[in-house]
């Protein structure tokens, strides 16, 4: 029987049978993998820890006729702080939905995996704004997938005067006020938002989250990211709507 040893993070789980669990793993070696974790829901199972949602583990998988079976798993990072906090878990669930849609079976996506893990680490271990972490994740994910918008200058004339920029969803990048013409769907953005977008798209992964923005700029990033993502991925992600419900409860 063939086996595969790979690190990966659980991005989806479905209970099956009396005590089994089918998990979807975002793996380093094979992209998306579906695997059966037999008995993983039993409290004393050696698989119970490493097969939980958001657990990043080292897996040994046996390849069966229809899917892999989990033979063993050793936890590398459990992201317990996220799973134990409803608000953080909601942000993480939003990112998991996106990841589950864009990765493919037998298609390694190491840069996307690193982005996802870094985003979860920031969400779990720092006091950075969860919403900013998510917006950075969304924009950088699209860029990594090949949908990077042109955000270093006006896509038409090359102007770098960021205080008069619009984000064109038709042109997939910046247009200055002189080149805007009849692009009625373009979104006027501030200099701060323009610089933030440029940073997110072009910065090194190690420095991706090392900046802060005002609430108004974060709101602009959200408007760009949500619409750009909806048009490129052809889906409207709604899990973050639950955050508004939580905010109302807190008030």
From Swiss-Prot:
Any single biological process term in GO: DNA recombination
Protein origin, superkingdom: Bacteria
GO cellular component, one term: bacterial nucleoid
Database matches in NCBIfam families: reco
Record function comment: Involved in DNA repair and RecF pathway recombination.
Key words, A-Z: DNA damage, DNA recombination, DNA repair
Gene3D superfamilies: Nucleic acid-binding proteins, Recombination protein O, C-terminal domain, Recombination protein O, zinc-binding domain
Pfam families reported in the protein's UniProt record: RecO_C, RecO_N
Name of the protein described by the UniProt record: DNA repair protein RecO
Similarity-based family: Belongs to the RecO family.
Record carries keyword DNA repair: yes
Keyword Cell membrane part of the UniProt annotation: no
């Amino acid at each position: 029987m063939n086996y595969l040893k790979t690190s990966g993070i659980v991005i989806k789980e479905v209970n099956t049978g009396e005590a089994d669990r089918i998990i979807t793993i975002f793996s380093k070696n094979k992209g998306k993998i579906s695997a059966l974790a037999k008995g993983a829901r039993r409290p004393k199972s050696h698989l119970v820890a490493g097969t939980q949602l958001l657990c990043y583990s080292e897996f040994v998988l046996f390849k069966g006729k229809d899917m892999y079976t989990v033979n063993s798993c050793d936890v590398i990072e459990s992201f317990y702080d996220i799973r134990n906090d409803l608000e953080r878990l909601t942000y993480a669930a939003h990112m998991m939905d996106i990841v589950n849609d864009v990765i493919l079976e037998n298609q390694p996506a190491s840069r996307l995996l690193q982005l996802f893990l870094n985003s979860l680490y920031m969400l779990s271990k720092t006091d950075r704004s969860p919403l900013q972490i998510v917006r950075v994740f969304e924009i950088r994910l699209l860029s990594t997938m090949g949908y990077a918008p042109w955000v270093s200058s006006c896509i038409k004339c090359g102007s770098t005067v960021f205080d008069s920029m619009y984000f064109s969803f038709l042109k997939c990048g910046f247009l200055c006020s002189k080149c805007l013409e009849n692009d009625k769907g373009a979104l006027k953005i501030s200099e701060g938002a323009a610089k933030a977008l440029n940073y997110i798209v072009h910065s090194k992964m190690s420095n991706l989250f090392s900046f802060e923005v005002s609430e108004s700029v974060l709101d602009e990033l959200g408007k760009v990211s949500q619409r750009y993502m909806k048009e490129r991925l052809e889906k409207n992600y709604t899990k973050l709507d639950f955050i508004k419900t939580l905010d109302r409860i807190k008030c």
